[in-house]
Curated annotation (Swiss-Prot):
<comment type="similarity">
    <text>Belongs to the GroES chaperonin family.</text>
</comment>
<comment type="subunit">
    <text>Heptamer of 7 subunits arranged in a ring. Interacts with the chaperonin GroEL.</text>
</comment>
<dbReference type="InterPro" id="IPR020818">
    <property type="entry name" value="Chaperonin_GroES"/>
</dbReference>
<dbReference type="GO" id="GO:0051087">
    <property type="term" value="F:protein-folding chaperone binding"/>
</dbReference>
<dbReference type="GO" id="GO:0005524">
    <property type="term" value="F:ATP binding"/>
</dbReference>
<dbReference type="GO" id="GO:0044183">
    <property type="term" value="F:protein folding chaperone"/>
</dbReference>
<dbReference type="Pfam" id="PF00166">
    <property type="entry name" value="Cpn10"/>
</dbReference>
<dbReference type="GO" id="GO:0046872">
    <property type="term" value="F:metal ion binding"/>
</dbReference>
<comment type="function">
    <text>Together with the chaperonin GroEL, plays an essential role in assisting protein folding. The GroEL-GroES system forms a nano-cage that allows encapsulation of the non-native substrate proteins and provides a physical environment optimized to promote and accelerate protein folding. GroES binds to the apical surface of the GroEL ring, thereby capping the opening of the GroEL channel.</text>
</comment>
<keyword id="KW-0143">Chaperone</keyword>
<dbReference type="GO" id="GO:0051085">
    <property type="term" value="P:chaperone cofactor-dependent protein refolding"/>
</dbReference>
<keyword id="KW-0963">Cytoplasm</keyword>
<dbReference type="InterPro" id="IPR011032">
    <property type="entry name" value="GroES-like_sf"/>
</dbReference>
<dbReference type="InterPro" id="IPR037124">
    <property type="entry name" value="Chaperonin_GroES_sf"/>
</dbReference>
<dbReference type="GO" id="GO:0051082">
    <property type="term" value="F:unfolded protein binding"/>
</dbReference>
<dbReference type="GO" id="GO:0005737">
    <property type="term" value="C:cytoplasm"/>
</dbReference>
<protein>
    <recommendedName>
        <fullName>Co-chaperonin GroES</fullName>
    </recommendedName>
</protein>
Length: 86
């Protein structure tokens, strides 16, 4: 993958959630909500406080989905990143 976000943007790969509940019920893909957390894969030159490899939580309706190397990523404005998971 070769993508460099511009300005105050970050490239995030969503973290896939489990496909079964604690009681063993399988959740079909069309019934799951998209995860609101992911791993930062690249950061723009104006981004502070977030670095590549950080796990972040982001706003539900933020960002733009893009496909790179057969994977789906999210390009987020840094204002849509709510926090870093430590």
């Amino acid at each position: 993958m070769n993508f460099q976000p511009l300005g105050k943007r970050v490239l995030v790969e969503r973290v896939e959630e489990t496909k079964t509940t604690a009681s063993g019920i399988i959740i079909p893909d069309n019934a799951k909500e998209k995860p609101l957390s992911g791993e930062v894969k690249a950061v723009g030159p104006e981004v502070e406080g977030v670095k590549t490899g950080d796990k972040v939580v982001f706003a539900k309706y933020g960002g733009t989905e893009i496909n790179l190397d057969d994977k789906t990523y999210l390009v987020l404005n840094i204002d849509d990143v709510l926090g870093v998971i430590k």
